Design a protein with these regions (language model features):
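Feature marks short, surface-exposed loop/turn motifs that line or immediately flank catalytic pockets
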Residues: 116, 194, 204-207
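Phosphate-binding active sites in nucleotide-utilizing proteins
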Residues: 176
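Conserved N-terminal segment of class I S-adenosyl-L-methionine
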Residues: 1-163, 167-171, 180-184, 248-264
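A short glycine-rich, Lys/Arg-flanked "PGG" loop and its adjoining helix->strand segment in the class I
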Residues: 181-196
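A structural motif corresponding to the C-terminal end of an alpha-helix
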Residues: 236-242
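Short, glycine-/aromatic-enriched active-site segment of Class I SAM-dependent methyltransferases
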Residues: 202-226, 231-236
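Hydrophobic residues in well-ordered beta-strands that form the structural core
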Residues: 45, 199-201
């Protein structure tokens, strides 16, 4: 672990309780995964700050490291990858899913990458922390009437007016966010009444995690700083002004949860 990459130990991002139980089985290389003694939420106690997360622990880097690790674990993981190749079809179907969820109007993609996820006729807007990806996304989105903001999620949301968006997409975002409640409150502010937030993120409560233990693909150090169960996500949604629906509740082995939150 790079000591420069750490900040003061975090309290629970779900309930702000200080006391937490160490989970050494799920900790690695000095990165300490803990369970809150107040609400049971699992999170990384010593999370890196944004600047170092971008420079030293970017998604592209940690993903590559994880891919090498899975290969080194041998035939078992290769078999798992082959058995779950259906996941590539889910990626192809994402555009149709978002069109069905949002219908039309202005939709914000938080962590938009290159800006090509949201299908027509949606008017795409984005927030992206990577300078290179933001530059690409901004060009793509401006051609369709939107634009992209270069900023972390919470700061990027501040650039938009209240009740501006018909929908918001956050795919693989909340597991990286040190203050997930603040991010959700920001989304709530920019959504119109009745607007929808579609979430996808690792499901710490899934069957695969219980079977795979520390080798579960949802563990990534140190850029995954929150580990949500469905119950954690539902509670946080209610506390920040949303109703909650677990979209893929009949897929207990799925590594990710899909959820639809609606602004009251």
């Amino acid at each position: 672990m790079n000591d420069r990459a750490t900040v003061a130990e975090r309290d629970c991002p779900a309930c702000e309780t200080r006391a937490a139980t160490e989970l050494p089985r799920f900790s690695r290389d000095g990165w300490r995964v803990v369970a809150c003694e107040g609400c049971g939420f699992v999170y990384l106690r010593n999370a890196p700050d944004y600047a170092l997360l971008v420079e030293e622990f970017a998604w592209e880097k940690t993903y590559a490291i994880e891919k090498v690790r899975r290969r080194s674990d041998g035939a078992f993981f290769r078999a798992v990858d082959r058995a779950t190749s259906w996941r590539t079809k889910l990626k192809r179907d994402a555009g149709a899913r978002y069109r069905k969820v949002f219908g039309s109007g202005r939709v914000l993609d938080v962590g938009c990458g290159g800006g090509e996820v949201l299908p027509e006729p949606l008017i795409p807007f984005g927030i992206e922390i990577s300078a290179g990806l933001h530059a690409i996304a901004d060009v793509v989105m401006r051609k369709r009437g939107g634009h992209a903001v270069h900023a972390p999620g919470i700061e990027g949301l501040k650039t938009f007016e209240d009740d501006f968006f018909d929908g918001v997409l956050m795919s693989s975002i909340l597991e990286h966010e040190k203050d997930p409640k603040a991010l959700l409150r920001g989304v709530h502010r920019v959504l119109k009444p009745g607007g929808k937030l579609y979430l996808k993120q690792p499901n710490y409560g899934c069957t695969n995690r219980k079977v795979m233990g520390p080798k579960w693909c949802g563990f990534r150090y140190p850029d995954h700083v929150n580990y949500f169960r469905v119950s954690d996500m539902a509670r946080m949604a209610r506390e920040t002004g949303f109703s909650f629906r677990h979209v893929n509740r009949f897929a207990p082995c799925a590594d990710n949860m899909h959820a639809l939150l609606t602004k009251a």
